């Protein structure tokens, strides 16, 4: 068991693209499985396969290329470079990733209007992401070596995937809807929130 970390480190150095893509895909897919479990539903492996397909074919590859592009365009860890990377990531990268998720999942689910979820949930999800991803990426850009950035984003993406997969299935793209389902899981829908 102790030999897995050196083997993973070697794989990331020798084959950074597939190692990062597979790690990212595995972690985000696990996030989908977790959100199903948190809702008390039976495992829907078909849904998790859809998430895995989308993440491995687009998101993990996009993140791998995007993070390296940001590093080339804005090299270093100086405060101005970090701020510029964060700004570019949130203004350009985040909208692409959120849009691709909602449209991609709608395509894989065979929905008639593949843009409906995007229209209904984009802004809420994007604004929710602004409360999470800048902190993740600040750590990523300032502390994580380039060859591990996609994998690190995948680790943090596990939590994000739990949220965004829930939003795509049941929520409205806000953190409030995700927390509400956790709260109401133990109470009936008629009981509502505790009175103050």
From Swiss-Prot:
Pfam families for this protein: Mpv17_PMP22
Keyword entries, A-Z: Membrane, Peroxisome, Transmembrane, Transmembrane helix
Tissue specificity note: Isoform 1 is detected in the kidney (at protein level). Isoform 1 and isoform 2 are expressed in the kidney, heart, liver, lung, pancreas and skeletal muscle.
Any one of the GO BP annotations: mitochondrial ribosome assembly
Renumbered residue ranges of the record's region Targeting to peroxisomes: 16-55
Lumenal side: 35-50, 109-150
GO cellular component entries: cytoplasm; intracellular membrane-bounded organelle; mitochondrion; peroxisomal membrane; peroxisome
Segments traversing the membrane: 17-34, 51-67, 91-108, 151-167
Membership in a protein family: Belongs to the peroxisomal membrane protein PXMP2/4 family.
Residue ranges annotated as Cytoplasmic topological domain: 1-16, 68-90, 168-196
Disulphide linkage map: none
Name of the protein in its database record: Mpv17-like protein
């Amino acid at each position: 068991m102790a030999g897995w970390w050196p083997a993973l480190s070697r794989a990331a150095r020798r084959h950074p693209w597939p190692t990062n893509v597979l790690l990212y895909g595995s972690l985000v897919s696990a996030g989908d499985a977790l959100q199903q479990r948190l809702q008390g539903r039976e495992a829907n492996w078909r849904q998790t396969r859809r998430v895995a397909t989308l993440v491995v074919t687009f998101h993990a590859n996009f993140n791998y290329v995007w993070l390296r592009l940001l590093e080339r365009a804005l090299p270093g860890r100086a405060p101005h470079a970090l701020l510029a990377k964060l700004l570019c990531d949130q203004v350009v990268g985040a909208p692409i990733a959120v849009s691709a998720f909602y449209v991609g999942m709608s395509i894989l689910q065979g929905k008639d209007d593949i843009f409906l979820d995007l229209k209904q949930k984009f802004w809420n999800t994007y604004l929710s992401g602004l409360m999470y991803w800048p902190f993740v990426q600040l750590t990523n850009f300032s502390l994580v070596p380039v060859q591990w950035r996609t994998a690190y984003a995948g680790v943090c993406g596990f939590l994000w995937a739990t949220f965004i997969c829930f939003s795509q299935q049941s929520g409205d793209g806000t953190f409030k809807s995700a927390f509400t389902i956790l709260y109401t899981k133990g109470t009936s829908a008629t009981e509502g929130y505790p009175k103050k």
